[in-house]
Amino acid sequence: MAQALGEDLLSELQDDSSSLGSDSELSGPSPYRQADRYGFIGGNSGELRLCQPSADLIRQREMKWVEMTLHWEKTMSRRYKKVKIQCRKGIPSALRARCWPLLCGARMCQKNNPGTYQELAAAPGDPQWMETIGRDLHRQFPLHEMFVSPQGHGQQGLLQVLKAYTLYRPEQGYCQAQGPVAAVLLMHLPPEEAFWCLVQICEVYLPGYYGPHMEAVQLDAEVFMALLRRQLPRVYKHLQQVGVGPLLYLPEWFLCLFTRSLPFPTVLRIWDAFLSEGAKVLFRVGLTLMRLALGTVEQRTACPGLLETLGALRAIPPTQLQEEVFMSQVHSVTLSERVLQQEIRIQLAQLSKSLPGPAPLPQARLPGAQAIFESQQLAGVRESTKPEIPRIVVQPPEEPKPPRRKPQTRGKTFHGLLIRARGPPIEGPSRSQRGSASFLDTRF
């Protein structure tokens, strides 16, 4: 039955493997409206047909994902390693809309907060944030078919999602880097699901990234430099010599989740792994880019100054950024969660005195889908087993019972009781006569 349901689901999804808005938001002749499989007009997604999996292999992966999502709790409880492996291979395009909300926990958040997004979307937004959001709408993927028209459902949906987040977290407000992140989510998800995915990314995967001080970005910048010094010491030395600090390139990478830095197919593969394994994927991607751009002596020699070095980080050959080739190198980077957390604690101790805002809390960052799933399951158990408030019940006083009376047996013999029970005695000689007469003289 599960297989039949999975095949029905695949048949519904395979007719749209890119975006939700592939219809007529553009005007003009059809040649000018032709978009690639990801929805970019003129094929601007940077897609290269190298090392692409075959149709049969894609079909097999789709069936595996359908089977896992149909039994998601069982899969995450017992077979998370399989989920991680499949995420590294890449989630099929037709199933990202189903898998991303499950991986990041947005599906459970939406279930636990029914009607919240509708209330936020219907409420008027803060004029301060609405003006800033309105200026940024046309900058998010202007060559994507969803976001070309100002009145199209892409820009309008993006406006509603970003406005809803400013109302959901008014103390944080809006950060410009949330725009491209929310736009990528809207390419695959309806606005409500995109909103809850954005909430999970901002509050669970990358807490402190999009606040007013962005203190977590500063912390991760120092962590990245420490990891770079350990794994690529010559590249680290070159950056120090030319004066390229991490804040010159890392915010664009990490805050936007590489949406503005890499080809779109590669970005999607990074997101698949990021939603599965957490923030350490971002560090692995950053280290891989450093090695590809400045890993050789010739590359470093060709970059004698700051501008040349920053240009080299943006001029990596597209063939090296193709998703299959690039992601295989990303996953080969040795970086465990334990090492990352250890380095975070070291750098946090050094930065806590100099940060203008509150110190970031690295323990609030959950390392991927498994930790999020376990956290939500634990929260559900606590909610279901919540103890009731004790109640004091006052019972009315009972009426006193009369004391039990003992039967009056004083002065009463057994013979007297027997006479009352059996009636008058049988006629015969008196007791004195019976005592003096013999047994044979007794009359019956």
Swiss-Prot record:
Record's compositionally biased regions (Basic residues): 403-413
SMART domains tied to this protein: TBC
InterPro entries: Rab-GAP-TBC_dom (IPR000195), Rab-GAP_TBC_sf (IPR035969), Rab_GAP_TBC_domain (IPR050302)
Signal sequence range: none
Ranges where the record places region Interaction with calcineurin: 404-444
Its biological purpose: Inhibits the Ras signaling pathway through its intrinsic Ras GTPase-activating protein (GAP) activity. Acts as a negative feedback inhibitor of the calcineurin signaling pathway that also mediates crosstalk between calcineurin and Ras.
Protein name per its UniProtKB record: Carabin
Source organism per UniProt: Mus musculus (Mouse)
